């Protein structure tokens, strides 16, 4: 297994959560959440993050319905992933993110109650779950 640095994004129309992880350990941690205007982040913030961490791969959560079908947000997340690749030349993978927000909220609540459930924390924690599920899939 390679020792690649990987950044994950939990795409949303108002906020985009970010996590970072190492493939060799299969672990991830929350980094931040960016505000977004109708799904568009401040691309300068994204560029700064990518320059700082220099990931070998970017994983973008793909929002699907529970039955696995696509929803309107699915196409927007794909577009966001394509823009990351087009603007910054990074390799991008998509990862099913069903229930990541539910799991993130439960984990944060367990650690800090309602006060821990601010939008940025939830989105960054969701990005961690997306990245960890990607690691799990790669491990087989």
From Swiss-Prot:
Keywords: Cytoplasm, Hydrolase, Nuclease, Ribosome biogenesis
EC number(s) recorded for this UniProt protein: 3.1.-.-
UniProt KW Ligase keyword: no
Record carries keyword Magnesium: no
Coiled coil: none
Family annotation (CDD domains): YqgF (cd16964)
GO biological process: one example: rRNA 5'-end processing
Taxonomic superkingdom: Bacteria
GO CC terms of this entry: cytoplasm
UniProt enzyme class: hydrolase
One of the record's GO molecular function terms: nuclease activity
Subcellular location: Cytoplasm
NCBIfam families the UniProt entry points to: RNAse_H_YqgF
Family the UniProt entry places it in: Belongs to the YqgF nuclease family.
Task of the protein: Could be a nuclease involved in processing of the 5'-end of pre-16S rRNA.
Protein name: Putative pre-16S rRNA nuclease
Species assigned in the record: Yersinia pestis
Underlying gene: yqgF
């Amino acid at each position: 297994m390679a020792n690649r640095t990987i950044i994950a994004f939990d795409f949303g129309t108002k906020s985009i959560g970010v996590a970072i992880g190492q493939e060799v350990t299969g672990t991830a941690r929350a980094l931040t959440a960016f505000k977004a205007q109708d799904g568009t982040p401040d691309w300068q913030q994204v560029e700064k993050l990518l320059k700082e961490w220099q990931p070998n791969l970017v994983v973008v959560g793909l929002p699907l319905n529970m039955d696995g079908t696509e929803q309107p947000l699915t196409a927007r997340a794909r577009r966001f992933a394509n823009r990351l690749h087009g603007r910054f030349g990074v390799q991008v993978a998509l990862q099913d993110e069903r229930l990541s927000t539910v799991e993130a909220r439960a984990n944060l609540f367990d650690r800090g109650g309602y006060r821990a459930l601010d939008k940025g924390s939830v989105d960054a924690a969701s990005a961690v779950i997306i990245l960890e599920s990607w690691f799990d899939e790669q491990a087989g």
